[in-house]
């Protein structure tokens, strides 16, 4: 997967390219992240990238010319088929379904806003989609872009150590993840559930599904409303609910 990034702070993306799962993906040639700064497309001595908005008001906007030229440079490097995405609180809210959709793209260009945003005409002429990571305001689009990169990269074949890891993440099937345990077997009097030590893979699968359903019911019940549960899932959820009556 190739991802181009338009940002005034490209050095922030070392957190993606140098560390963790995404860093290994870059090192192994499974993920490529290339950055362009609008400052590199300025022609004045101060490398100005912001300007006052028409109509007045607080704050500044990103200048059109440097931003458009940076986007055009990224498009030229990407070739055909690269989707241009603007990270914006006004965009579609990113969820696991959205991550799965975005992961189908082999090329993406992520545009990170700063200041009070960008000229609406840039959005209309250069941007294919707008995405948001939540209903709150950040200082810029870099953190949302890194969130998007991290989440979609988990679906690149070979990125995760185990092929089932991404499939078992929270939200992949609309449910929260089940509890997980590692050594020691007993920690301050709290024991690992015996079923996980049994070696019975069918029972372990059943326990994990039951816990996943139950945790979703306890913590995010609204998620269950949009799911068509199987007969097995309905039985397991009912069992969990009986076991956890107030």
From Swiss-Prot:
Function according to Swiss-Prot or TrEMBL: Specifically methylates guanosine-37 in various tRNAs.
Family membership: Belongs to the RNA methyltransferase TrmD family.
Residue positions binding S-adenosyl-L-methionine: 113, 133-138
Taxonomic lineage from the root: Bacteria, Pseudomonadati, Pseudomonadota, Gammaproteobacteria, Enterobacterales
Native organism: Yersinia pestis
Subcellular location: Cytoplasm
Reaction(s) this enzyme catalyzes, per UniProt: guanosine(37) in tRNA + S-adenosyl-L-methionine = N(1)-methylguanosine(37) in tRNA + S-adenosyl-L-homocysteine + H(+)
Keywords: Cytoplasm, Methyltransferase, S-adenosyl-L-methionine, Transferase, tRNA processing
Entry superkingdom: Bacteria
Entry GO terms, CC: cytosol
UniProt-listed Enzyme Commission number(s): 2.1.1.228
Name under which the protein is recorded: tRNA (guanine-N(1)-)-methyltransferase
UniProt gene name: trmD
A Gene Ontology biological process term: tRNA N1-guanine methylation
Known partners and oligomeric status: Homodimer.
Keyword Magnesium found: no
One Pfam short name: tRNA_m1G_MT
One MF term in the entry's GO annotations: tRNA (guanine(37)-N1)-methyltransferase activity
């Amino acid at each position: 997967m190739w991802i181009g990034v338009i940002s005034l702070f490209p050095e922030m993306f070392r957190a993606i390219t140098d560390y963790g799962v995404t860093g290994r993906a870059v090192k192994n040639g499974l993920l490529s992240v290339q950055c362009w700064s609008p400052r590199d497309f300025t022609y004045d001595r101060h490398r100005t990238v912001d300007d006052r908005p028409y109509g007045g008001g607080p704050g500044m906007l990103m200048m059109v010319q440097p931003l458009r030229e940076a986007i055009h440079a990224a498009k030229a490097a990407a070739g055909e088929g690269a989707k241009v995405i603007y990270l914006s609180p006004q965009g579609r809210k990113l969820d696991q379904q959205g991550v799965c959709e975005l992961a189908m793209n082999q090329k993406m260009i992520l545009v990170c806003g700063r200041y009070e945003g960008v000229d609406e005409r840039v959005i209309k002429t250069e941007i294919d989609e707008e995405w948001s990571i939540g209903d709150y305001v950040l200082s810029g689009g870099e953190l949302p872009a890194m969130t998007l990169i991290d989440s979609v990269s988990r679906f690149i074949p070979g990125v995760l150590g185990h092929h089932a890891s991404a499939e078992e993440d929270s939200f992949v099937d609309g449910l929260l993840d089940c509890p997980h345990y590692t050594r020691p077997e007993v920690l301050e009097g709290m024991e690992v559930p015996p079923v996980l030590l049994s070696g019975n893979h069918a029972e372990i699968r059943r326990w994990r599904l039951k816990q996943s359903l139950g945790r979703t019911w306890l913590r995010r019940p609204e998620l269950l409303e949009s799911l068509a549960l199987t007969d097995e899932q309905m039985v397991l959820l009912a069992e969990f609910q009986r076991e956890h009556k107030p």
